[in-house]
């Protein structure tokens, strides 16, 4: 079998993490079987679909490294195809016009609720006479098109993730609306289940891979495949992504779109790596870092979990850190540059590039997200240092002024070319010995004076970087004023 899969997002919002994870699984399966990965944009919702969302979705997929082999196909450009299919159902007596008003449907559901029955359409307009239809039309009623679903129909399929699935027609909510109403009485806007089946048949989709929240839709769609005489594809219903409370991840949980993750400073390979693990386990359970290509070579549905996949920020951060720590220095510096520029830090990206590479090397072992670099390196770029409360407490301790003065004097006298880490250490050792100070006091005081905080990257490397900017002596002198106050 030639594998043809599709990702079919709706442009009613930015690319969601759930849709992106579904895209990852489709892409992995296609690549594993040397198949075709197709992009279809389901933009039939005219009110909610927006061009900017379409662009966001396409950009997000490209950014993640999931280029499609065919498409994008747009459902809004295929409406005639759907209407032809609906007319075929009408002509064959498999669908009909339903003239129920919203008020009548509400009354029906209310009565069902009072009887403790599940809400469903009672198929009351399935067998209208021509006279009844004419009477409804004379009232100005606008009909929807409903596809007939018999209560005694049995729908079965072997799900690639969940195994044998069984549904009864009576559990599908009655005859299904496949097209909206129109004032003219013509076939209106085709709805999701109809359009999906027509597209999947037309595009020869072999496998439909999507979230478990579509299982009920699958039962309905199989009936449509059978009605059209089409080949029913294989189905794989993947686990939902859950929040920490075990509920489906939603916008209420905050960050959910791929562009949000980009803004937070996650790289595409790290995020794609993490999404691969949201519901799938590699054969080697200890392997957690791999490229999409590596994952594709190992991917199969036997290792896709049935249970929901909880979104774990700590795990994502750890994976992100592994990628950042392993990036070549120049590549990481290039990735950090936009964050420094957005923060309006004072530097020349060309003239200061050697210094920026050193800054990158300093913070790389501690970097978790690209965006973290803004706060981590602020003390290196700023010309007006602000001392934290902890740093000021350190500077106010006894003997700190003596310690700082013992470093300032030789530093001020040293020639630019003479300064190095070894020389800096000699200044520290000399003031410790000459003033009978504890080395820890001197080191803590220098950190407070030079960085404005009591924690941060390696002190000596930070000092050298500040010296190159001509900032170290100035800061030590300012800190001495605080210590002497």
From Swiss-Prot:
Motif 'KMSKS' region in this chain: 248-252
Question: Keyword Ubl conjugation on this protein?
Answer: no
What's the catalysed reaction?
A: tRNA(Glu) + L-glutamate + ATP = L-glutamyl-tRNA(Glu) + AMP + diphosphate
Keyword Transmembrane helix among UniProt keywords: no
Give the matching InterPro entries.
Answer: aa-tRNA-synth_I_cd-bd, aa-tRNA-synth_I_codon-bd_sub2, aa-tRNA-synth_I_CS, aa_tRNA-synth_I_cd-bd_sf, Glu-tRNA-ligase_bac/mito, Glu-tRNA-synth_I_codon-bd_sub1, Glu/Gln-tRNA-synth, Glu/Gln-tRNA-synth_Ib_cat-dom
Where in or outside the cell it occurs: the entry states:
Cytoplasm
Q: Name one GO cellular component term.
A: cytosol
Q: Which domain of life is it from?
A: Bacteria
- What GO molecular-function term can you cite, just one? tRNA binding
Q: Could you tell me the EC number(s) of this protein? A: 6.1.1.17
Keyword terms: Aminoacyl-tRNA synthetase, ATP-binding, Cytoplasm, Ligase, Nucleotide-binding, Protein biosynthesis
Single Gene Ontology BP term? glutamyl-tRNA aminoacylation
According to the UniProt entry, where does the motif 'HIGH' region sit in this chain?
Answer: 9-19
Entry function: Catalyzes the attachment of glutamate to tRNA(Glu) in a two-step reaction: glutamate is first activated by ATP to form Glu-AMP and then transferred to the acceptor end of tRNA(Glu).
Concerning its family, UniProt says: Belongs to the class-I aminoacyl-tRNA synthetase family. Glutamate--tRNA ligase type 1 subfamily.
What is the annotated quaternary arrangement, including any partners? Monomer.
Q: Which NCBIfam families match?
A: gltX_bact
Instruction: Quote the protein name from its UniProt record.
Output: Glutamate--tRNA ligase
Q: Report the source organism.
A: Acaryochloris marina (strain MBIC 11017)
């Amino acid at each position: 079998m030639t594998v043809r899969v599709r990702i079919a997002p709706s442009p009613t919002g930015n690319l969601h993490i759930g849709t992106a994870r579904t895209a990852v699984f489709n892409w992995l399966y296609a690549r594993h079987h040397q198949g075709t990965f197709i992009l279809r944009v389901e933009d039939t919702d005219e009110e909610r679909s927006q061009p900017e969302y379409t662009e966001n979705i396409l950009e997000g997929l490209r950014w993640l490294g999931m280029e499609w082999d065919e498409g994008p196909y747009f459902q809004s450009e295929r409406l005639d195809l759907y209407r032809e299919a609906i007319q075929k159902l009408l002509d064959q007596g498999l669908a009909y016009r339903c003239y129920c008003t919203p008020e009548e449907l509400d009354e029906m559901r209310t009565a069902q609720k009072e009887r403790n029955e599940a809400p469903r359409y009672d198929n009351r307009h399935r067998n209208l006479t021509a006279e009844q239809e004419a009477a409804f039309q004379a009232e100005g009623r606008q009909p929807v098109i409903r596809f007939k679903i018999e209560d005694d129909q049995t729908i079965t399929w072997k799900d690639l993730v969940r195994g044998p699935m069984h549904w009864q027609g009576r559990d599908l909510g009655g005859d299904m609306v496949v097209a909206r109403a129109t004032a003219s009485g013509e076939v209106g806007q085709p709805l999701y289940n109809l359009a999906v089946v027509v597209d999947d048949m037309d595009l020869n989709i072999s496998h439909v891979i999507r979230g478990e929240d579509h299982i009920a839709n699958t039962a309905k769609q199989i009936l449509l495949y059978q009605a059209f005489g089409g080949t029913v594809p294989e189905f794989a219903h993947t686990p939902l992504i859950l929040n920490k409370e075990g509920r489906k991840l939603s916008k209420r949980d905050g960050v959910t779109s791929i562009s949000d993750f980009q803004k937070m400073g996650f790289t595409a390979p790290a995020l794609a790596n993490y999404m691969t693990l949201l519901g799938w386990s590699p054969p080697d359970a200890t392997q957690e870092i791999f490229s999409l290509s590596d994952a594709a070579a190992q991917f199969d549905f036997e290792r896709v979990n049935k249970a929901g996949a909880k979104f774990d920020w700590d795990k994502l951060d750890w994976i992100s850190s592994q990628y950042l720590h392993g990036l070549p220095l120049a590549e990481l510096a290039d990735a950090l540059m936009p964050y420094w520029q957005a923060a309006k830090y004072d530097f020349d990206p060309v003239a200061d590039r050697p210094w920026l590479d050193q800054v990158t090397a300093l913070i790389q072992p501690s970097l978790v997200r690209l965006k973290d670099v803004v706060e981590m390196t602020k003390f290196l770029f700023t010309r007006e240092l602000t001392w934290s409360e902890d740093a000021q407490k350190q500077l106010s301790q006894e003997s700190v002024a003596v310690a700082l003065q013992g470093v300032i004097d030789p530093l001020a006298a040293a020639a630019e070319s003479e300064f190095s880490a070894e020389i800096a250490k000699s200044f520290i050792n000399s003031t410790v010995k000459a003033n009978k100070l504890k080395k820890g006091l001197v080191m803590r005081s220098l950190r407070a004076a030079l960085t404005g905080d009591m924690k941060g990257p390696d002190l000596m490397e930070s000092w050298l970087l500040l010296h190159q900017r001509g900032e170290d002596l100035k800061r030590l002198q300012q800190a001495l004023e605080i210590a002497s106050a």
